[in-house]
Structure formats: structure tokens, C-alpha cells
């Protein structure tokens, strides 16, 4: 079982090791990480994502966003997920949430459980639905979204790839399979 926890300064060493595992596998984009994949200073990243949780301090070019690590029973970081409370023009095709599971922990249902738990966060935040984008060729993520009640809405081109937008009704029990 996993739980979602907010990144803290105390998790620095573990978080850097988590990020490095992606890089070691040739993956230099960590979806749902609020640019953790591009940030060298973990403490500054923690401050930035904390600021983005509040209307008074959110970056003016961004939206209120909650970012969580998923930790397992041994308190090891196994994934990351974010929840963007609204969509601006930039995010309209990217959706309300992104997520990644560390390469060594994939195909264990972690992404499905992270998204299920994030639906509870969205519900508490008063959100009625989430829009999620996924590249058509990312079958594991498509299955994760569908398992959590995702309904296909439309397709679009993204970085020369075909991608789809799915919608999940937050207030529906279908989101809690």
C-alpha cells in the first residue's frame, strides 16, 4: 500500500535518488514532478511547490498545484503526482494532473493507486472533474486512467505525437474502483 505525502526537506537524499533512477533509465522528463527533473536545488524546489499551493504565493504564470510523493510501506519514494486545481491556456491540453512511477516499481498498480488517492484530494478541494492527457502509445497510463473512471474526450497532437484527453468525474463513485 502507498500513501501520498508532500515533499519535505527531510526527504532530500531519497528524492534525489528517486530522480536519478529515471535519469539512469534514459528518462529525463518526470511527469507530475513540477519541474523536479529540471531542478538542481531540491530545497528551492520544495519551497517553490509549497508556494504554488496557495493563491497568495502561487507563481503568477502558474496555477494552484498540490504535489505529492507516493511512498510505500518502507517509506520509500515510489512515485510522484501533482494536481493542478485549474487549467490555464498552457495547461488546457496537459490536464489537471501528471504522474510518474520510478522505473523499478512499475507494473505493480502504483500509478492506479496514486491517481485513486489524488481523486480524494481533488474532491476535498471542491473539484468536480479532472482532465488528463496521455500519449496514445502509453498503454499503461491509459489503463490507469480508465481504471479510475476515465472517459475519452478528444485527441490532439503534442510534440509530434498523438495524445488523448480523458475526463474523470471526481464526485462519482466510478473514480474509486
Spans of model-derived segments:
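GNAT-family acyltransferases
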Residues: 1-96, 159-177
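Glycine-/small-residue-rich active-site loops that bind phosphorylated ligands and cofactors
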Residues: 89, 106-107, 137
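Conserved acetyl-CoA-binding loop-helix of GNAT-fold acetyltransferases
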Residues: 99-101, 107-120, 124, 143-147
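Conserved GNAT acetyl-CoA-binding A-motif
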Residues: 122-133
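Short secondary-structure boundary/hinge segments and terminal tails
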Residues: 123, 140, 162-164
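Conserved beta-strand-loop-alpha-helix junction that forms the acyl-donor binding cleft
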Residues: 132-142
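Conserved catalytic-core motifs of GNAT/GCN5-like acyltransferases
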Residues: 133-134, 146-165
